[in-house]
Each structure stands twice: as C-alpha cells, then as structure tokens.
UniProtKB/Swiss-Prot annotation:
It is a peripheral membrane protein. Required for replication in 'nonpermissive' cells, including primary T-cells, macrophages and certain T-cell lines, but is dispensable for replication in 'permissive' cell lines, such as 293T cells. In nonpermissive cells, Vif-defective viruses can produce virions, but they fail to complete reverse transcription and cannot successfully infect new cells. The modification Phosphoserine is found at residue 147. Homomultimer; in vitro and presumably in vivo. Interacts with viral Pr55Gag precursor and human APOBEC3G. The interaction between Vif and APOBEC3G is species-specific, which may play a role in restricting the replication of HIV to humans. Forms an E3 ligase complex by interacting with human CUL5 and elongin BC complex (ELOB and ELOC). This is Virion infectivity factor. GO terms for biological process: viral life cycle. GO terms for cellular component: host cell cytoplasm; host cell plasma membrane; membrane; virion component. The modification Phosphothreonine is found at residue 98. Processed in virion by the viral protease. A motif (BC-box-like motif) lies at residues 147-156. Residues 154-167 are annotated as: Multimerization. The BC-like-box motif mediates the interaction with elongin BC complex.
Amino acid sequence: MEEGKNWIVVPTWRVPGRMERWHSLVKHLKYRTKDLEEVRYVPHHKVGWAWWTCSRVIFPLEGESHLEIQAYWNLTPEKGWLSSHSVRLTWYTEKFWTDVTPDCADSLIHSTYFSCFTAGEVRRAIRGEKLLSCCNYPQAHKAQVPSLQYLALVVVQQNGRPQRKGAARKQWRRDHWRGLRVARQDYRSLKQGGSEPSAPRAHFPGVAKVLGILA
C-alpha cells in the first residue's frame, strides 16, 4: 500500500511578489546602519534540509525570547504556486512558542530595536524645547490605542523639524518611506557589485508594509 503524504500545517501570511525588498532592508539595517546588528539573517543556502524555506530572520528580544520571520517558497508546486511566497511569524522561548500577527511582530521588534520617545520628552515639549529623541518605528504603534502624550509628541516631531513653511508633512512622509528606498538602492548596488558609504539611521516602515502582506 502506497504511503500517503504527510502534511505540516502552519499559519502563514501570503506575500505578493518576491522577497528581495525584505532581504535588502534587513541586510541594510544589519550591516550598514547597525540598527539590527544583533539580528541573525540566514539565507536559503544556509538553511539546510528545509528546502521550502527562502530565509530566516531571527530577532533576539528581551528575556531570552526571540521573534523569527521565516519566509517560504515553492509551497505547492503541484498547483503551480511557484512564484508566490509566504512568511511565518513566530515568537518563542526555550519552552514555549506561538505564532503572532504582523502588528504584534512590529510591537515586539520596537520593544528591543529602534528608538522611541523617552520619558522626558513630554516636559521638553511643554517647555517648548527641542526634542532629543524621536520614534523611528511609528508603524509599531498602529495597533495600539495611542496616549495623548504620544499623539502630541508625534505632532511635535512632524512639525518641529527645520523645514520650509508647509513642507513638514511631506517631509515626514518621505522619512516614513526612506527605509524602503534605501533597501531598493542597497539591493541594486549589491547586484552591480558596487559599494556606498553608510547611510543614516532610517525609520522602519513595519513588517506588513515592507513585505506587502495580504491578510
């Protein structure tokens, strides 16, 4: 009797298109800006026996926990789904693991990586002083109920930069997408074999935004 197939079912998030944008952004933030210096990036040729895995990105978090973003490809070749990818988002410790949503993944990453407003910024904003810190991961706050202090600091951060009159909002949008732009530029430079000087620390657009996840 012929043995049937053994299926492994895990929750995944489908990603339209290819994964170069995600890989380029991770490598840019790990090797150039050093924002993700402690993150472990495992490309497909180093994964080993898991041939369906395109890459693994492991974020060490606080308290000996980790967040892993594992990208899959060639999931159902018998149905012709060769050009599609998906990702699995897993939070785990030594004795426990669970799958998380992109919003939760953003919050976990922001709790360890990328700076946010410090406690003293509210007092500085009230006194009309220049803010000494800013939030480089605004997408991580999207799923949360924002406090009045956070909303006020966001407004100060957007409008308090030295910009021409009426250009502050447009500049904020440019900064929000800068992470994607530098990722594309970094990917092109790697393909051409060139090298560029280190770029300044960039805002992180968020896991769902970068991957283009379709819920």
